Amino acid sequence: MVIIDEEVDLLYNDKGTCTGKNQKGEITLMKKKALAVLMAAAMVASMTACGGSSDKAADSSAATEDKADSSAAAGDGEAVELVVGGVTSSSAKDAVTYFGEKVNEYSNGTITIADFPDNQLGNDEQRFEMTQNGECDISIGSTSSVSASYHDLYLYDVYYMFLSKQEVYDVGFGGEAGQKILEGFDQFGLKGLAMWENGFRNVTTNNTPVNTVADLKGLKLRTMENSIHLAAWKAMGANPTPMAFSELYTAMQQGTVDGEENPLGIITGNGFEEVEKYCTLTEHVYTPYYVVMNADKYNSLSADQQAAIEKAMAEATTYQYEQSNKYEEESIDTMEAAGCTVTALDEAAKLEFKAAADSGDGLSLAKEQMDNPDLADKMVEELEAYRK
């Protein structure tokens, strides 16, 4: 299974964000390299002109004008290249490739993509800002990474809001509240294209298996620095311990913490199965990826090109969910091969965990931070109707 690009030595945190090399400094380096290339090209053009080739200079000028005209006419269905900034997730990378193929097909070859996966354009927050200002056309990132900017995304931090992936797909994303949250990206000058899957978070421990809520009592569990997450774990009896993700592997190896919780891909992608003996598929909170596009760029395209993007993205989204499920199965195989015991909760056990987490009142905490808390009430209403 490929979770981390084998050609680079990077660590990724529990938001799927690079904690290694691909940070803002590297973006600056990329820009410097690009500038150097442009300057070199300009020097070559100048030398050619000095050689007396006036016809070639005229041709070059005409080509430049043609390119400018082509760019300006993108709204008429002319060729356009979209820069896509992506994450480290294997399923998301697969889906971007799939999207690129489909959007090229459905646009009759007028749309191509320039794909920059593995946080090459910076972390989630940086790419979010780059897409707002037009430096990047489409970006993918964890909702947890940008909820401090887009407060309604805190709804996806509520523990046991969703009890299955199908609930997430049909209600969390496809319901009225989910659609309004996706549409809400427009306040940032962005077009919400889709919600993709980062996945359910699950518990791993190094000494004590967690099969019931009682097993969590006093367990020193590394968690995210998030008030909603902390309240839920305290309500379930654990001792939540925020810690830098970069320190987690060593902390588990040395017994500084008893365990941690993350999506399966993050667990095996960082080799946690090497220092943990047990994994319980608690599926306590589901974290999505957002997929957004610069609104001005989207609106500059022709109606046919916009339709091509919508159709290709819908198909790529279904494909991403399928790939995510495939990689999760491979992650379980990886853990078991390493000697880790993986336990799935039955419905009764999961409802026990949900009842304990609910006592932490995470929904109220989320609503306090949301700009549109009525969306939380609507989501709960839709889920209750869906479960009947």
What residues fall within each predicted segment?
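Short, low-complexity disordered leader/linker segments with a strong preference
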Residues: M1-E81, K388
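Transmembrane alpha-helix boundary/anchor motif
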Residues: A45, E176-K180, I228
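N-terminal secretory/targeting leader peptides
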Residues: G51-A58, A74-Q166, F185-K388
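Hinge/lid segment of periplasmic solute-binding proteins
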Residues: D170-G189
